[in-house]
Amino acid sequence: MSAVKPLWYRWARVYFAGGCLVGTGVLFWYTIRPTDEQLIARFSPEVKADYERNKELRQQEQKRLIEIVKETSSSSDPIWKAGPIGSPFEKEQRNLSMELVDAELFHKTKHEEQQKQEIDRANEESKEAERLMQQNKKPWWKFF
């Protein structure tokens, strides 16, 4: 007859094997997974430029999504009916735009803000130049 191992021994082996699996997964997660910077560095130049160009747009979309989630969570409607995001399973909502932020409008407003900043900076520089010109208009024959 074979000696039957106690029940606690079998369960200890199960927990040990599970712990080894989880530990291996965590170890792989921290050693193999690239950081965001490493991943971006591996992008091709075109993809990297597109990523940098649309970074603020994605952040704006994320903010808008958080706002929608807050609105939806405060509503008493079911989650699939609340909020402005259309469900792909509803016939009348299938063709709705899933964009949270209008990309053209976002880029246009960003460009306008940059232009306003450049104009303000140019105005400040011209005022500074006028002030310096007023200081230098003192006649040379007066000593005091």
Curated annotation (Swiss-Prot):
Query: How does this protein lie in the membrane?
Result: Single-pass membrane protein
Q: Where is the composition biased (Basic and acidic residues)?
A: 109-131
Q: Kindly list the GO CC terms recorded for this protein.
A: mitochondrial inner membrane; mitochondrial membrane
- Cross-referenced InterPro entries: Cbp4 (IPR012420)
- The question of whether Repeat is a record keyword is answered with no
Q: Name one GO biological process term.
A: mitochondrial respiratory chain complex III assembly
Residues in coiled coil? 108-138
Q: Where would you find this protein in the cell?
A: Mitochondrion inner membrane
**What does the protein in this record do?**
Essential for the assembly of ubiquinol-cytochrome c reductase. It has a direct effect on the correct occurrence of the Rieske protein, core 4, core 5 and apocytochrome b.
Listed Pfam families: CBP4
Q: Does the keyword Mitochondrion apply?
A: yes
Protein name as annotated? Assembly factor CBP4
Q: Alphabetically list the UniProt keywords.
A: Chaperone, Coiled coil, Membrane, Mitochondrion, Mitochondrion inner membrane, Transmembrane, Transmembrane helix
Q: Which family does it belong to?
A: Belongs to the CBP4 family.
Instruction: Give the source's domain of life in one word.
Output: Eukaryota
Transmembrane ranges, per UniProt, are 10-32
